[in-house]
């Protein structure tokens, strides 16, 4: 694996982490709020 390929893959991983984790947190918070509203 070349250095540029490794950098590309690591940037993809970090982009996924930056996008997926906040999205997952937001979904959890929204679902919890929905349950509260339904009660």
Curated annotation (Swiss-Prot):
One Pfam family here: PsbX
Subcellular location(s) per record: Cellular thylakoid membrane
Q: Which Gene3D superfamilies match?
A: Single helix bin
Sorted UniProt keywords: Membrane, Photosynthesis, Photosystem II, Thylakoid, Transmembrane, Transmembrane helix
Question: What top-level branch of life does the organism fall under?
Answer: Bacteria
Main localization is membrane
Q: Name one GO biological process term.
A: photosynthesis
Q: Where, by residue number, does the polypeptide cross the bilayer?
A: 10-30
Q: How does it sit in the membrane?
A: Single-pass membrane protein
Which Gene Ontology cellular component terms are annotated? photosystem II; plasma membrane-derived thylakoid membrane
| InterPro entries (alphabetical) | PSII_PsbX, PSII_PsbX_type_1_subfam
Q: Which HAMAP family match?
A: PSII_PsbX_1 (MF_01386)
Subunit structure as annotated in this protein's UniProt entry: PSII is composed of 1 copy each of membrane proteins PsbA, PsbB, PsbC, PsbD, PsbE, PsbF, PsbH, PsbI, PsbJ, PsbK, PsbL, PsbM, PsbT, PsbX, PsbY, Psb30/Ycf12, peripheral proteins PsbO, CyanoQ (PsbQ), PsbU, PsbV and a large number of cofactors. It forms dimeric complexes.
Family per similarity comment: Belongs to the PsbX family. Type 1 subfamily.
* Known function: Involved in the binding and/or turnover of quinones at the Q(B) site of photosystem II (PSII). PSII is a light-driven water plastoquinone oxidoreductase, using light energy to abstract electrons from H(2)O, generating a proton gradient subsequently used for ATP formation.
Q: What is this protein called?
A: Photosystem II reaction center protein X
State the organism named in the record. Answer: Prochlorococcus marinus (strain MIT 9313)
């Amino acid at each position: 694996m070349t250095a540029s390929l490794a950098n590309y893959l690591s940037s993809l991983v970090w982009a996924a982490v930056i996008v997926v984790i906040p999205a997952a947190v937001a979904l959890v918070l929204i679902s919890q709020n929905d349950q509260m509203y339904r009660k």
